[in-house]
């Protein structure tokens, strides 16, 4: 109740029972707590200094992470890595056994990866291409090239399902070659995991596939030479660079259909090398992309076209604070569309 007038507001309760009412017109100033799952946040006192102290510590930590990243990338540019041999006859056999014809971009990317691996400077290359355009085949070829020089390969993926999918794909492609592929995840028994780790440490496993479990303290490679990161946009900075720090002269191959801005910026600035796979495989239509200003008529026409062919639309907006406003605009433009909102703080 504000001067006798009822007004909708959000009630915030602080430590000690202090209460603060936030007008619905100021909802953009607050957001839902986002932290570790199951973690109970500590409540601060209204007017206290603890929250400001926490923010200052967080800013300081972010600056330190950024500094460490700059140091890491600078060091990788000057450090001496492992120079791989030129292709063996087995490498040629593997590539010849690929059941599809390489696209022009696959050919160029394969050449670029091999040239990187044969240099003394550690490779750090981003392969950017849509789903189904052949990024995994490039990873298989790079992995086998490393194995051919008695190096081990770590493949970091974001989900257990993808780890199993890659395990089956790699095992099937390399079944006729001297290469041991294995995986590690939470569905393996403790005994099975321990055996996998033992074999890895003894060099009996050439390629290990897994989620962030493979960067655990108990995971020790005998001679890690190549790290492949798939769908890197789903990993945090610390997870990816923790494994890079494990061995600074390891070659890095990153695969992504939608690289995060930081990764793309590093590639555009030259801190990382970039290969783009634009050419679709035979019988696959290339994705059509247009960059235009926000235009309601264009948006309406595009959505209506998809609905008319029983398709679905994924509309991405970059701010949670007014994402519902955008949903309202879309609903106004296309009243017959069923629209739902989802974001990371739900």
Report residues per predicted region.
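Inter-lobe coupling/hinge segments of SF2-like helicase ATPases
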Residues: 80-82, 111, 119-346
